[in-house]
Regions:
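Acidic, mature catalytic/reactive cores of soluble proteins
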Residues: 1-205
Length: 205
């Protein structure tokens, strides 16, 4: 389902559970691990765009990596890992019966999804015919300010496309936590774990 789980890929030492060694029948969906894979797709997309600007044979690679990124973005958006009440991304445990338990600990894990963002020339990302054919709705949505592709005016008046893993309102709410002295912001930088967890947290169940 393109959501990453199983530990190792993310910031395992910040979780109240051992993400690499879960109880039998329990699996985990990781906000940060999923974001790392989206960031990988974004990096490869940008490289493919550079190559395609010199040789159209690489257009297929542009399509491939944009498709991967959008699949991950859609999966994360539909997953429910973003808590609308708290305005934050949480990992989630799923047991053998399908019961879902969010790990409501605010750490850097929940901020990683907003880092999976890139900026490319809008004309360049729209140029390949295969891209226009397969992602016509996505590119049309960009013009109306919807979806993971958003148009912006870059330096020198150039039109660029910001391709982001999370929706703008999700990024804004997450950043509000970053700048809050009662959560992540400290006199010495950012905390790895929110100050709200001075009171110990226990995973339900």
């Amino acid at each position: 389902n393109t959501l990453v789980g199983g530990g190792f890929l993310g910031l395992d030492n910040l979780s109240p559970v051992d993400r690499s060694h879960l109880p039998d029948g329990v699996r985990i969906e990781q906000a940060d691990g999923t974001a790392w894979m989206a960031a990988y797709s974004m990096a490869m997309l940008i490289l493919a765009l550079v190559l395609a600007s010199e040789n159209p044979v690489y257009d297929d690679m542009v399509v491939k990596f944009l498709e991967q990124f959008i699949l991950i973005s859609d999966a994360l958006d539909a997953s429910g890992l973003f808590d609308e009440e708290d305005g934050f991304f949480y990992d989630r445990l799923i047991d053998a019966h399908g019961n879902r338990t969010p790990i409501k600990v605010q750490t850097l894990v929940g901020l990683i999804p907003i880092l999976a963002t890139g900026s490319v020339p809008l004309e360049q990302v729209s140029r390949p015919s295969a891209l226009r054919k397969r992602f016509a709705r996505r590119l049309d949505d960009a013009e109306s300010g919807e979806g993971p592709i958003l148009p912006v005016r870059g330096p020198g008046g150039t039109d660029r496309a910001v391709v982001a893993l999370v929706r703008p309102e999700q990024a804004l709410r997450s950043m509000q936590r970053v700048l809050d002295e009662d959560t992540f912001l400290s006199p010495h930088g950012l905390r790895s774990v929110s100050r709200r967890h001075v009171v110990p947290y226990t995973v339900p169940g």
